[in-house]
Protein backbone atom coordinates (compact mmCIF):
# COMPACT_ATOMS: atom_id res chain seq x y z
CA UNK A 1 0.00 0.00 0.00
CA UNK A 2 1.03 3.64 -0.28
CA UNK A 3 2.91 4.49 2.88
CA UNK A 4 3.43 8.18 2.16
CA UNK A 5 1.83 10.81 -0.06
CA UNK A 6 1.11 9.30 -3.46
CA UNK A 7 3.94 10.38 -5.75
CA UNK A 8 4.25 9.69 -9.47
CA UNK A 9 7.03 12.04 -10.59
CA UNK A 10 9.29 9.28 -11.90
CA UNK A 11 6.43 7.58 -13.74
CA UNK A 12 5.46 10.92 -15.27
CA UNK A 13 9.02 11.49 -16.48
CA UNK A 14 9.32 7.99 -17.92
CA UNK A 15 5.94 8.24 -19.66
CA UNK A 16 6.94 11.52 -21.30
CA UNK A 17 10.13 9.85 -22.54
CA UNK A 18 8.27 6.72 -23.65
CA UNK A 19 5.88 8.73 -25.82
CA UNK A 20 8.85 9.88 -27.89
CA UNK A 21 10.06 6.31 -28.34
CA UNK A 22 6.92 4.15 -28.74
CA UNK A 23 3.44 4.95 -30.13
CA UNK A 24 1.44 6.31 -27.22
CA UNK A 25 4.32 5.45 -24.93
CA UNK A 26 3.27 1.81 -24.54
CA UNK A 27 3.36 -1.54 -26.30
CA UNK A 28 -0.31 -2.36 -25.75
CA UNK A 29 -2.95 0.41 -25.75
CA UNK A 30 -4.76 -0.28 -22.47
CA UNK A 31 -1.52 0.23 -20.53
CA UNK A 32 -1.55 3.96 -21.34
CA UNK A 33 -4.45 4.62 -18.88
CA UNK A 34 -6.08 6.71 -21.62
CA UNK A 35 -9.53 5.28 -20.95
CA UNK A 36 -9.37 6.50 -17.35
CA UNK A 37 -7.99 9.92 -18.30
CA UNK A 38 -4.74 9.45 -16.46
CA UNK A 39 -1.11 8.46 -16.93
CA UNK A 40 0.28 5.00 -16.22
CA UNK A 41 2.51 4.18 -13.30
CA UNK A 42 5.73 2.47 -14.38
CA UNK A 43 6.36 -0.82 -12.63
CA UNK A 44 9.74 -1.68 -11.14
CA UNK A 45 9.07 -5.17 -9.78
CA UNK A 46 6.36 -7.65 -8.82
CA UNK A 47 6.06 -10.31 -6.14
CA UNK A 48 3.06 -12.30 -4.97
CA UNK A 49 -0.04 -10.13 -5.23
CA UNK A 50 1.91 -6.88 -5.26
CA UNK A 51 3.48 -4.42 -7.68
CA UNK A 52 6.01 -1.71 -6.87
CA UNK A 53 6.36 1.31 -9.13
CA UNK A 54 9.41 3.44 -9.85
CA UNK A 55 8.27 6.02 -7.27
CA UNK A 56 8.22 3.43 -4.50
CA UNK A 57 4.45 2.96 -4.28
CA UNK A 58 3.24 -0.57 -3.54
CA UNK A 59 -0.05 -1.86 -4.90
CA UNK A 60 -2.32 -4.83 -4.34
CA UNK A 61 -2.99 -5.71 -7.96
CA UNK A 62 -5.92 -7.44 -9.63
CA UNK A 63 -4.66 -7.60 -13.21
CA UNK A 64 -2.37 -10.65 -12.89
CA UNK A 65 -0.43 -9.48 -15.99
CA UNK A 66 -3.86 -9.52 -17.72
CA UNK A 67 -4.37 -13.11 -16.64
CA UNK A 68 -1.17 -15.20 -16.62
CA UNK A 69 -0.02 -14.64 -13.03
CA UNK A 70 -2.63 -16.84 -11.37
CA UNK A 71 -0.13 -18.33 -8.90
CA UNK A 72 1.23 -14.88 -8.07
CA UNK A 73 4.16 -12.91 -9.38
CA UNK A 74 7.66 -14.35 -9.06
CA UNK A 75 6.39 -17.58 -7.53
CA UNK A 76 9.50 -19.19 -5.98
CA UNK A 77 8.89 -22.57 -7.62
CA UNK A 78 8.46 -21.02 -11.07
CA UNK A 79 11.56 -18.87 -10.58
CA UNK A 80 13.56 -21.89 -9.42
CA UNK A 81 12.50 -23.90 -12.48
CA UNK A 82 13.51 -21.04 -14.78
CA UNK A 83 16.88 -20.63 -13.05
CA UNK A 84 17.55 -24.30 -13.66
CA UNK A 85 16.48 -24.01 -17.30
CA UNK A 86 18.31 -20.79 -18.25
CA UNK A 87 21.86 -22.21 -18.44
CA UNK A 88 20.60 -24.78 -20.96
CA UNK A 89 19.75 -22.05 -23.46
CA UNK A 90 16.90 -19.66 -24.16
CA UNK A 91 15.75 -21.01 -27.53
CA UNK A 92 16.64 -23.90 -29.82
CA UNK A 93 14.32 -23.82 -32.82
CA UNK A 94 14.10 -27.60 -32.49
CA UNK A 95 11.84 -30.14 -30.74
CA UNK A 96 12.26 -30.60 -26.99
CA UNK A 97 11.08 -32.99 -24.29
CA UNK A 98 9.45 -30.01 -22.59
CA UNK A 99 7.02 -29.55 -25.49
CA UNK A 100 5.91 -33.17 -25.17
CA UNK A 101 5.44 -32.77 -21.43
CA UNK A 102 3.46 -29.54 -21.78
CA UNK A 103 1.29 -30.95 -24.57
CA UNK A 104 0.51 -34.04 -22.50
CA UNK A 105 -0.40 -31.85 -19.52
CA UNK A 106 -2.85 -29.81 -21.61
CA UNK A 107 -4.37 -32.92 -23.21
CA UNK A 108 -4.85 -34.57 -19.81
CA UNK A 109 -6.47 -31.42 -18.40
CA UNK A 110 -9.00 -30.66 -21.14
CA UNK A 111 -11.26 -33.51 -22.32
CA UNK A 112 -11.98 -31.92 -25.71
CA UNK A 113 -8.27 -31.70 -26.57
CA UNK A 114 -6.50 -34.57 -28.35
CA UNK A 115 -3.63 -32.67 -30.01
CA UNK A 116 -1.91 -29.32 -29.39
CA UNK A 117 0.12 -26.83 -31.45
CA UNK A 118 2.06 -24.23 -29.47
CA UNK A 119 2.46 -20.67 -30.77
CA UNK A 120 3.65 -17.40 -29.23
CA UNK A 121 0.49 -15.43 -28.43
CA UNK A 122 -3.25 -15.56 -28.13
CA UNK A 123 -3.59 -13.68 -31.42
CA UNK A 124 -1.55 -16.37 -33.18
CA UNK A 125 -3.71 -19.05 -31.57
CA UNK A 126 -7.06 -17.61 -32.68
CA UNK A 127 -5.79 -16.64 -36.12
CA UNK A 128 -4.45 -20.15 -36.67
CA UNK A 129 -7.58 -21.83 -35.29
CA UNK A 130 -9.78 -19.94 -37.73
CA UNK A 131 -7.50 -20.75 -40.64
CA UNK A 132 -7.71 -24.37 -39.55
CA UNK A 133 -11.51 -24.26 -39.34
CA UNK A 134 -11.63 -22.92 -42.89
CA UNK A 135 -9.20 -25.56 -44.11
CA UNK A 136 -11.13 -28.36 -42.43
CA UNK A 137 -14.58 -27.30 -43.68
CA UNK A 138 -13.68 -25.76 -47.03
CA UNK A 139 -15.81 -22.75 -46.07
CA UNK A 140 -14.95 -19.07 -45.52
CA UNK A 141 -17.41 -17.36 -43.19
CA UNK A 142 -16.91 -17.12 -39.44
CA UNK A 143 -19.15 -15.97 -36.61
CA UNK A 144 -17.90 -13.95 -33.66
CA UNK A 145 -19.67 -12.04 -30.89
CA UNK A 146 -19.84 -8.35 -30.12
CA UNK A 147 -17.46 -7.52 -27.30
CA UNK A 148 -15.42 -10.71 -27.66
CA UNK A 149 -11.78 -9.84 -28.35
CA UNK A 150 -9.72 -12.52 -30.05
CA UNK A 151 -6.50 -10.64 -30.72
CA UNK A 152 -5.60 -8.18 -33.43
CA UNK A 153 -5.70 -10.34 -36.56
CA UNK A 154 -7.44 -8.39 -39.34
CA UNK A 155 -10.43 -10.70 -39.75
CA UNK A 156 -11.24 -10.43 -36.03
CA UNK A 157 -11.10 -6.64 -35.71
CA UNK A 158 -14.78 -6.32 -36.38
CA UNK A 159 -17.39 -3.97 -34.92
CA UNK A 160 -20.87 -5.47 -34.64
CA UNK A 161 -23.80 -3.53 -36.09
CA UNK A 162 -26.96 -2.58 -34.28
CA UNK A 163 -29.23 -5.15 -35.91
CA UNK A 164 -29.94 -8.70 -34.80
CA UNK A 165 -26.77 -9.81 -36.54
CA UNK A 166 -24.85 -8.00 -39.22
CA UNK A 167 -21.94 -8.26 -41.55
CA UNK A 168 -18.84 -6.77 -39.97
CA UNK A 169 -17.08 -3.57 -40.90
CA UNK A 170 -13.38 -2.93 -40.21
CA UNK A 171 -12.81 -1.80 -36.64
CA UNK A 172 -9.37 -0.35 -37.33
CA UNK A 173 -7.90 1.71 -40.16
CA UNK A 174 -5.68 -0.47 -42.29
CA UNK A 175 -8.04 -3.44 -42.27
CA UNK A 176 -9.50 -3.96 -45.77
CA UNK A 177 -13.25 -4.42 -45.95
CA UNK A 178 -12.62 -7.52 -48.02
CA UNK A 179 -10.76 -9.07 -45.08
CA UNK A 180 -13.73 -8.78 -42.73
CA UNK A 181 -16.47 -9.36 -45.30
CA UNK A 182 -16.68 -13.02 -44.29
CA UNK A 183 -16.90 -12.20 -40.57
CA UNK A 184 -20.44 -12.29 -39.18
CA UNK A 185 -21.31 -10.89 -35.77
CA UNK A 186 -24.01 -11.43 -33.16
CA UNK A 187 -24.63 -10.15 -29.63
CA UNK A 188 -23.28 -12.37 -26.87
CA UNK A 189 -25.97 -14.37 -25.06
CA UNK A 190 -28.36 -13.98 -28.03
CA UNK A 191 -28.94 -17.47 -29.38
CA UNK A 192 -31.74 -16.28 -31.67
CA UNK A 193 -29.30 -13.97 -33.47
CA UNK A 194 -26.98 -16.90 -34.12
CA UNK A 195 -29.87 -19.02 -35.35
CA UNK A 196 -30.74 -16.21 -37.78
CA UNK A 197 -27.20 -16.21 -39.15
CA UNK A 198 -27.24 -19.95 -39.69
CA UNK A 199 -30.63 -19.66 -41.37
CA UNK A 200 -29.17 -17.08 -43.75
CA UNK A 201 -25.91 -19.00 -44.31
CA UNK A 202 -26.78 -22.64 -43.56
CA UNK A 203 -23.75 -24.21 -45.27
CA UNK A 204 -21.25 -21.33 -45.38
CA UNK A 205 -19.93 -20.94 -41.82
CA UNK A 206 -16.52 -22.52 -41.22
CA UNK A 207 -16.14 -21.62 -37.56
CA UNK A 208 -17.90 -19.96 -34.66
CA UNK A 209 -15.50 -18.44 -32.13
CA UNK A 210 -16.25 -16.96 -28.74
CA UNK A 211 -14.90 -16.36 -25.27
CA UNK A 212 -17.14 -18.78 -23.32
CA UNK A 213 -16.94 -16.26 -20.48
CA UNK A 214 -16.16 -12.84 -21.90
CA UNK A 215 -13.31 -10.92 -20.30
CA UNK A 216 -12.67 -8.13 -22.78
CA UNK A 217 -16.00 -6.36 -22.34
CA UNK A 218 -15.73 -6.70 -18.62
CA UNK A 219 -16.79 -10.08 -17.28
CA UNK A 220 -19.87 -11.33 -19.15
CA UNK A 221 -21.37 -14.64 -18.05
CA UNK A 222 -23.09 -17.11 -20.39
CA UNK A 223 -26.77 -17.54 -19.65
CA UNK A 224 -28.20 -21.01 -19.10
CA UNK A 225 -28.56 -22.75 -22.44
CA UNK A 226 -26.43 -20.32 -24.47
CA UNK A 227 -23.28 -22.43 -24.79
CA UNK A 228 -25.35 -25.58 -25.15
CA UNK A 229 -27.32 -23.94 -27.94
CA UNK A 230 -24.16 -22.94 -29.78
CA UNK A 231 -22.87 -26.50 -29.54
CA UNK A 232 -26.13 -27.83 -31.00
CA UNK A 233 -26.20 -25.28 -33.84
CA UNK A 234 -22.59 -25.84 -34.86
CA UNK A 235 -23.09 -29.61 -34.80
CA UNK A 236 -26.18 -29.29 -36.97
CA UNK A 237 -24.46 -27.10 -39.57
CA UNK A 238 -21.06 -28.77 -39.68
CA UNK A 239 -19.39 -25.68 -38.24
CA UNK A 240 -16.25 -25.84 -36.08
CA UNK A 241 -16.98 -24.54 -32.57
CA UNK A 242 -13.95 -22.67 -31.21
CA UNK A 243 -13.63 -21.65 -27.57
CA UNK A 244 -11.15 -18.82 -27.08
CA UNK A 245 -9.91 -19.79 -23.62
CA UNK A 246 -6.80 -17.62 -23.72
CA UNK A 247 -8.21 -15.86 -20.67
CA UNK A 248 -10.43 -18.53 -19.10
CA UNK A 249 -8.24 -21.58 -19.67
CA UNK A 250 -6.94 -22.97 -16.35
CA UNK A 251 -8.52 -19.98 -14.58
CA UNK A 252 -12.20 -20.88 -14.21
CA UNK A 253 -11.27 -24.48 -13.46
CA UNK A 254 -8.29 -26.69 -14.21
CA UNK A 255 -10.06 -27.72 -17.42
CA UNK A 256 -11.10 -24.16 -18.22
CA UNK A 257 -14.56 -22.79 -18.93
CA UNK A 258 -15.47 -25.84 -21.00
CA UNK A 259 -14.95 -28.13 -18.02
CA UNK A 260 -16.83 -25.77 -15.72
CA UNK A 261 -19.84 -25.62 -18.06
CA UNK A 262 -19.62 -29.13 -19.46
CA UNK A 263 -19.45 -28.09 -23.14
CA UNK A 264 -16.81 -29.57 -25.46
CA UNK A 265 -15.78 -27.39 -28.42
CA UNK A 266 -14.00 -28.70 -31.51
CA UNK A 267 -11.02 -26.37 -31.08
CA UNK A 268 -9.66 -24.52 -28.06
CA UNK A 269 -7.35 -21.50 -28.00
CA UNK A 270 -5.06 -21.09 -24.99
CA UNK A 271 -2.44 -18.64 -23.77
CA UNK A 272 -1.59 -16.55 -20.71
CA UNK A 273 -1.56 -19.08 -17.83
CA UNK A 274 0.02 -21.90 -19.86
CA UNK A 275 3.17 -19.78 -20.20
CA UNK A 276 3.47 -18.98 -16.52
CA UNK A 277 4.05 -15.32 -17.36
CA UNK A 278 6.19 -15.87 -20.45
CA UNK A 279 4.92 -15.35 -24.03
CA UNK A 280 2.94 -18.35 -25.26
CA UNK A 281 -0.21 -19.44 -27.03
CA UNK A 282 -1.72 -22.69 -28.28
CA UNK A 283 -4.54 -24.02 -30.37
CA UNK A 284 -5.76 -27.51 -29.70
CA UNK A 285 -8.62 -29.87 -30.30
CA UNK A 286 -9.92 -32.97 -32.01
CA UNK A 287 -7.28 -35.13 -33.67
CA UNK A 288 -9.06 -35.27 -37.04
CA UNK A 289 -9.00 -31.47 -37.26
CA UNK A 290 -5.51 -30.93 -35.83
CA UNK A 291 -4.06 -33.45 -38.30
CA UNK A 292 -4.75 -30.82 -40.98
CA UNK A 293 -1.88 -28.71 -39.58
CA UNK A 294 1.50 -28.84 -41.35
CA UNK A 295 3.60 -30.91 -41.54
CA UNK A 296 0.96 -33.59 -40.87
CA UNK A 297 -1.46 -31.85 -43.24
CA UNK A 298 -1.76 -28.98 -45.72
CA UNK A 299 -2.78 -26.09 -43.41
CA UNK A 300 0.43 -24.11 -42.94
CA UNK A 301 1.44 -22.40 -39.71
CA UNK A 302 4.92 -21.95 -38.23
CA UNK A 303 6.85 -19.92 -35.65
CA UNK A 304 10.51 -19.33 -34.80
CA UNK A 305 9.97 -19.24 -31.03
CA UNK A 306 6.97 -21.59 -30.79
CA UNK A 307 7.39 -24.07 -27.93
CA UNK A 308 10.11 -21.91 -26.40
CA UNK A 309 11.82 -23.93 -23.64
CA UNK A 310 11.58 -21.18 -21.03
CA UNK A 311 7.86 -20.67 -21.65
CA UNK A 312 7.32 -24.43 -21.50
CA UNK A 313 9.28 -24.61 -18.24
CA UNK A 314 7.27 -21.83 -16.59
CA UNK A 315 4.00 -23.23 -17.89
CA UNK A 316 4.67 -26.78 -16.71
CA UNK A 317 5.48 -25.59 -13.20
CA UNK A 318 2.47 -23.24 -13.08
CA UNK A 319 0.06 -26.00 -14.10
CA UNK A 320 1.67 -28.33 -11.57
CA UNK A 321 0.91 -25.80 -8.83
CA UNK A 322 -2.68 -25.41 -10.04
CA UNK A 323 -3.29 -29.16 -9.78
CA UNK A 324 -2.77 -29.14 -6.01
CA UNK A 325 -5.78 -29.78 -3.75
CA UNK A 326 -7.84 -26.75 -2.77
CA UNK A 327 -6.44 -24.42 -5.43
CA UNK A 328 -9.66 -23.52 -7.19
CA UNK A 329 -11.71 -23.53 -4.01
CA UNK A 330 -9.34 -20.87 -2.66
CA UNK A 331 -9.57 -18.78 -5.82
CA UNK A 332 -13.37 -19.05 -5.75
CA UNK A 333 -13.59 -17.98 -2.13
CA UNK A 334 -11.27 -15.01 -2.46
CA UNK A 335 -12.97 -13.82 -5.65
CA UNK A 336 -16.43 -14.05 -4.13
CA UNK A 337 -15.26 -12.15 -1.05
CA UNK A 338 -13.89 -9.33 -3.20
CA UNK A 339 -16.68 -9.13 -5.79
CA UNK A 340 -19.41 -9.22 -3.15
CA UNK A 341 -17.59 -6.64 -1.05
CA UNK A 342 -17.09 -4.21 -3.92
CA UNK A 343 -20.71 -4.46 -5.02
CA UNK A 344 -21.99 -3.96 -1.49
CA UNK A 345 -19.71 -0.94 -1.04
CA UNK A 346 -20.95 0.63 -4.28
CA UNK A 347 -24.61 0.13 -3.43
CA UNK A 348 -24.16 1.33 0.16
CA UNK A 349 -22.75 4.56 -1.29
CA UNK A 350 -25.81 4.93 -3.51
CA UNK A 351 -24.23 4.11 -6.86
CA UNK A 352 -25.90 2.21 -9.66
CA UNK A 353 -23.72 -0.89 -9.87
CA UNK A 354 -23.72 -4.50 -10.99
CA UNK A 355 -21.21 -7.23 -10.20
CA UNK A 356 -20.44 -10.08 -12.58
CA UNK A 357 -18.17 -12.95 -11.53
CA UNK A 358 -17.22 -16.46 -12.55
CA UNK A 359 -14.45 -18.20 -10.64
CA UNK A 360 -11.38 -15.97 -10.44
CA UNK A 361 -12.73 -13.38 -12.94
CA UNK A 362 -14.89 -10.42 -11.92
CA UNK A 363 -16.08 -6.94 -12.91
CA UNK A 364 -17.86 -4.16 -11.05
CA UNK A 365 -19.93 -2.30 -13.65
CA UNK A 366 -21.14 1.21 -12.86
CA UNK A 367 -24.63 0.63 -14.25
CA UNK A 368 -27.86 -1.02 -13.21
CA UNK A 369 -27.98 -4.68 -14.13
CA UNK A 370 -28.19 -7.08 -15.57
CA UNK A 371 -25.09 -6.80 -17.75
CA UNK A 372 -25.40 -9.74 -20.14
CA UNK A 373 -23.76 -8.42 -23.32
CA UNK A 374 -21.51 -5.66 -24.63
CA UNK A 375 -24.40 -3.25 -25.23
CA UNK A 376 -25.34 -3.55 -21.56
CA UNK A 377 -21.73 -3.03 -20.50
CA UNK A 378 -21.47 0.14 -22.58
CA UNK A 379 -24.20 1.73 -20.46
CA UNK A 380 -21.67 1.97 -17.62
CA UNK A 381 -20.72 5.39 -16.25
CA UNK A 382 -17.17 5.59 -17.59
CA UNK A 383 -16.37 8.90 -15.91
CA UNK A 384 -17.35 7.48 -12.56
CA UNK A 385 -15.24 4.40 -13.22
CA UNK A 386 -12.26 6.63 -14.06
CA UNK A 387 -12.59 8.49 -10.76
CA UNK A 388 -12.97 5.21 -8.90
CA UNK A 389 -9.88 3.80 -10.60
CA UNK A 390 -7.77 6.83 -9.67
CA UNK A 391 -8.98 6.83 -6.08
CA UNK A 392 -8.12 3.16 -5.69
CA UNK A 393 -4.70 3.65 -7.28
CA UNK A 394 -3.92 6.44 -4.82
CA UNK A 395 -4.81 4.04 -1.99
CA UNK A 396 -2.55 1.29 -3.25
CA UNK A 397 -4.98 -0.84 -5.26
CA UNK A 398 -4.13 -1.46 -8.91
CA UNK A 399 -7.22 -2.27 -10.98
CA UNK A 400 -7.51 -2.68 -14.73
CA UNK A 401 -7.56 0.84 -16.25
CA UNK A 402 -10.75 0.17 -18.20
CA UNK A 403 -14.35 -0.57 -17.32
CA UNK A 404 -14.26 -3.15 -20.10
CA UNK A 405 -11.54 -5.40 -18.69
CA UNK A 406 -12.13 -8.20 -16.22
CA UNK A 407 -10.30 -8.29 -12.91
CA UNK A 408 -8.39 -11.38 -11.80
CA UNK A 409 -7.65 -13.11 -8.52
CA UNK A 410 -4.44 -15.01 -7.78
CA UNK A 411 -3.40 -17.63 -5.26
CA UNK A 412 -1.04 -15.06 -3.74
CA UNK A 413 -3.86 -12.79 -2.54
CA UNK A 414 -4.90 -13.01 1.09
CA UNK A 415 -8.11 -12.27 2.93
CA UNK A 416 -6.33 -9.26 4.39
CA UNK A 417 -5.65 -7.98 0.87
CA UNK A 418 -9.31 -8.39 0.00
CA UNK A 419 -10.53 -6.66 3.14
CA UNK A 420 -8.14 -3.75 2.62
CA UNK A 421 -9.33 -3.42 -0.98
CA UNK A 422 -13.00 -3.36 0.02
CA UNK A 423 -12.31 -0.82 2.77
CA UNK A 424 -10.45 1.40 0.29
CA UNK A 425 -13.34 1.08 -2.13
CA UNK A 426 -15.81 2.20 0.54
CA UNK A 427 -13.75 5.33 1.12
CA UNK A 428 -13.42 6.11 -2.58
CA UNK A 429 -17.04 5.34 -3.45
CA UNK A 430 -18.34 7.51 -0.63
CA UNK A 431 -16.51 10.48 -2.15
CA UNK A 432 -17.53 9.98 -5.80
Curated annotation (Swiss-Prot):
One of the GO biological process terms: protoporphyrinogen IX biosynthetic process
Catalytically driven reaction(s): (S)-4-amino-5-oxopentanoate = 5-aminolevulinate
GO CC terms: cytoplasm
Pathway stated in the Swiss-Prot or TrEMBL entry: Porphyrin-containing compound metabolism; protoporphyrin-IX biosynthesis; 5-aminolevulinate from L-glutamyl-tRNA(Glu): step 2/2; Porphyrin-containing compound metabolism; chlorophyll biosynthesis
Main location: cytoplasm
Subcellular location(s) of the protein: Cytoplasm
EC number: 5.4.3.8
Pfam families attached to this UniProt entry: Aminotran_3
An example Gene Ontology molecular-function term: glutamate-1-semialdehyde 2,1-aminomutase activity
SUPFAM superfamilies in alphabetical order: PLP-dependent transferases
Keywords, alphabetical: Chlorophyll biosynthesis, Cytoplasm, Isomerase, Porphyrin biosynthesis, Pyridoxal phosphate
Domain of life (superkingdom): Bacteria
Cofactor: pyridoxal 5'-phosphate
Keyword Isomerase: yes
InterPro entries: 4pyrrol_synth_GluAld_NH2Trfase, Aminotrans_3, Aminotrans_3_PPA_site, PyrdxlP-dep_Trfase, PyrdxlP-dep_Trfase_major, PyrdxlP-dep_Trfase_small
Sites bearing N6-(pyridoxal phosphate)lysine, chain numbering: 272
Family from the record: Belongs to the class-III pyridoxal-phosphate-dependent aminotransferase family. HemL subfamily.
NCBIfam families membership: hemL (TIGR00713), PRK00062.1 (NF000818)
Oligomer status and interactors: Homodimer.
HAMAP family: HemL_aminotrans_3
Protein name: Glutamate-1-semialdehyde 2,1-aminomutase
Taxonomic lineage: Bacteria, Bacillati, Cyanobacteriota, Cyanophyceae, Gloeobacterales
Amino acid sequence: MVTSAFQTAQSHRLFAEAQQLMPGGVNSPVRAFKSVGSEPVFIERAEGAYLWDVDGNRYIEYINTWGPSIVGHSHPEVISALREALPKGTSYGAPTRLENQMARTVIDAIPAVEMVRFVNSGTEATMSALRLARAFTGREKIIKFEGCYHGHADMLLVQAGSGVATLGLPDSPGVPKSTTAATLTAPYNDLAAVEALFKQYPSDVAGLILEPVVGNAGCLVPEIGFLEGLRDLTHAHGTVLIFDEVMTGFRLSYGGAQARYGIEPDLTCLGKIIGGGLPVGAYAGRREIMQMVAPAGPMYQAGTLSGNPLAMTAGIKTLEILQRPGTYERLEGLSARLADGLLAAAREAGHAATGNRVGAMFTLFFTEGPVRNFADAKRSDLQKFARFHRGMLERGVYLAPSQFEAGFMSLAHTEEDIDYTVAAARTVLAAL
